[in-house]
């Protein structure tokens, strides 16, 4: 199959490890991937630089960064500098203040618009088990219901060619994601997961902690296999 004949996929590429891995999976499956990132007023804009580097490394056929400033009304520690980033870990049954109201709903809607305009058949997201333990818009039932909406709300869907919402990591934990990223030769050092907006990762926020613990666990597993 020539490059032009490959099916197109839109990938929501934040610049983090999860979205990079989901994007690489789509590429491995033979898709021409268009990356879609968002400048939504997040304090950690450093992730957008990571998204650019990853888009170049993965040789995406297009990469769009959309400006949609959700910090105008805040409601999250990621978009409101007056709120503190939590460092206490993910508490069962509690939605953390890093949840951004409506973020994924907005992102997926824009992704579906781009997919339909580009005649792409899939929209790939990096949401996973660690995400949906805390965030309502990362859960399997949310994705299932949004798929129904996508089929109803688009020309492609009404004509029976609906755009599929895919979350290949949906049931994976962070260790599994790190292992897959390594298998796919993703340069993990190019990715950015920290919630804080500094030039260096803080190592203290929940995102840093979960990522670093997974990296350490995978290193330990790999070391044990070599001895």
UniProtKB/Swiss-Prot annotation:
Picking any one GO molecular function of the record gives: ligase activity, forming carbon-nitrogen bonds
Q: Which keywords accompany this UniProt record?
A: ATP-binding, Ligase, Metal-binding, Nucleotide-binding, Queuosine biosynthesis, Zinc
Q: How is the cofactor bound?
A: Binds 1 zinc ion per subunit.
Q: Name one Pfam family in it.
A: QueC
Enzymatic class: ligase
Identify the residues that bind Zn(2+): 194, 202, 205, 208
User: What reaction is this protein's catalytic activity?
Assistant: 7-carboxy-7-deazaguanine + NH4(+) + ATP = 7-cyano-7-deazaguanine + ADP + phosphate + H2O + H(+)
Q: Which cofactor does it need?
A: Zn(2+)
Q: In which pathway does it act?
A: Purine metabolism; 7-cyano-7-deazaguanine biosynthesis
> Member of which family?
Belongs to the QueC family.
Protein name listed in UniProt: 7-cyano-7-deazaguanine synthase
Its lineage opens with: Bacteria, Bacillati, Cyanobacteriota, Cyanophyceae, Synechococcales
């Amino acid at each position: 199959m020539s490059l032009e004949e490959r099916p197109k996929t839109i990938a929501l590429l934040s610049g983090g490890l999860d979205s990079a891995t989901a994007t690489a999976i789509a590429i491995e499956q033979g898709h021409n991937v268009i990356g879609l990132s968002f400048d939504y007023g997040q304090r950690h804009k450093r992730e957008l630089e990571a998204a650019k580097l990853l888009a170049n490394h993965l040789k995406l056929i297009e990469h769009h960064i959309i400006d949609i400033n959700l910090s105008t009304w805040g409601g999250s520690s990621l978009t409101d500098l007056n709120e503190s980033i939590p460092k206490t870990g993910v508490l069962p049954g509690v939605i953390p203040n890093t949840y951004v109201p409506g973020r994924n709903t907005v992102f997926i809607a824009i992704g579906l618009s781009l997919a339909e305009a580009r005649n792409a058949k899939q929209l790939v997201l990096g949401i996973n088990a660690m995400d949906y333990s805390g965030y309502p818009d990362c859960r399997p039932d949310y994705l299932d219901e949004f798929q129904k909406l996508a089929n109803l709300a688009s020309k492609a869907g009404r004509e029976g060619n609906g755009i599929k919402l895919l979350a290949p990591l949906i049931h994976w934990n962070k260790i599994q994601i790190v292992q897959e990223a390594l298998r796919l030769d993703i340069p993990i050092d190019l990715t950015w997961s920290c919630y804080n907006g500094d030039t260096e990762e803080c190592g203290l926020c929940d995102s840093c902690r979960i990522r670093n613990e997974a990296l350490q666990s995978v290193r330990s597993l790999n070391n044990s296999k070599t001895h």
